[in-house]
Amino acid sequence: MSSRNFWLSKEVFIGLAFFFAITVPVVVFGGAKVVFVDKSANGAEDGTSAHPYQSISEALDHVKKGTEVRIKNGEYKENITIPKDVKLVGDSENRDKVIIKARNEDKPTVQMKDETEMSYITVKGGRHGVRILPDTKAHLYNVVVKNSNRDGIHIDSAKTDKRHRVILDTIEVTRNDRAGIFAETRFITLINSYITLNKSDGVDFAMGTEAWLGDNSFSGNKGSGIKVILDNSSLSSKKNTIRNNGHDGIEVNTYGASGTLTLKKATIVKNNSYGIARIARTTKGANTFGGIILGDGVNVNKIDQNNQGSVSHIIYGF
């Protein structure tokens, strides 16, 4: 009896094994969440690791929501749009190994739709290096953006809530022909990043922006390190270094609506004009600079050695 049960169990086991041998590859590959790209590949292309797509664009044409597109080392000369809920990941944690360079310099090199992510990649050239489209949530991690014809990263407007937040973490934005980062009204987190050597401002935030800036360096930009419009904005900053910029360390503009800019543990030094410039764009704007809040005690800022002084008088810019 026990022997018969044993053999029945083996038969069932063999049958199940045969079933899974047939069905599991269909489940794994049919519902695959990772698609591979390798420009040096030859032959058939189906997005598997054995037969990767040869271009990022081809891979993106075939992906579904929830897919990760993993890119092998190399320079890919393309302009791409990342579809909704797709991740673009360089295969090496050395972000200089995977380069996306604009084929058409009149278009953004990379455009990002809603719930998209990009990491371990260098983006070069294009009208903008990266354009984050309206009403989207996006995340960049360990990315370099450089040599674009306009803004390095251009962020279109959205509601200022977590659902539409843009997270920029451990990025380098450098040598772009306009601002390093330009943002319309948004909720933005910028941390652990270098914004350097851009031909206009390091970052330029429109009115109504909510932003957290932490542990960043803004240096060597031809404009101001940080440029903001205070009206209806809520901006918080801690442990940022803003130095050697061609204009002000921070340029604060206002048209008269209230807003806040909180600075803690900032180092604002050796900028060509003021450490902090206060520019009223209307008569009413001259009365709203109380929204600039400077940390004290353990949160005190170092604002020193700026060519025209630490904090400007109110400058009338109209």
Features from the language model and the residues they span:
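N-terminal secretory signal peptides that target proteins for export/translocation
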Residues: M1-L8
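Bacterial N-terminal signal peptides
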Residues: I14-P25
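Right-handed parallel beta-helix/beta-solenoid
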Residues: V27-E58, D91
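Right-handed parallel beta-helix/beta-spiral solenoid domain characteristic of secreted/periplasmic
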Residues: K39, V86-R131
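Acidic glycine-/aspartate-rich tracts in secreted/extracellular proteins
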Residues: S40-A44, T67, G74-E75, S92-R95
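Beta-strand repeat architectures
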Residues: L60-T67, D114-T116
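Short glycine/acidic-rich loop motifs that flank beta-strands on beta-rich extracellular proteins
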Residues: E68, Y76-I82, I99, R103-P108, ...
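Right-handed parallel beta-helix
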Residues: D91, K97, E115-G125, K137-N149, ...
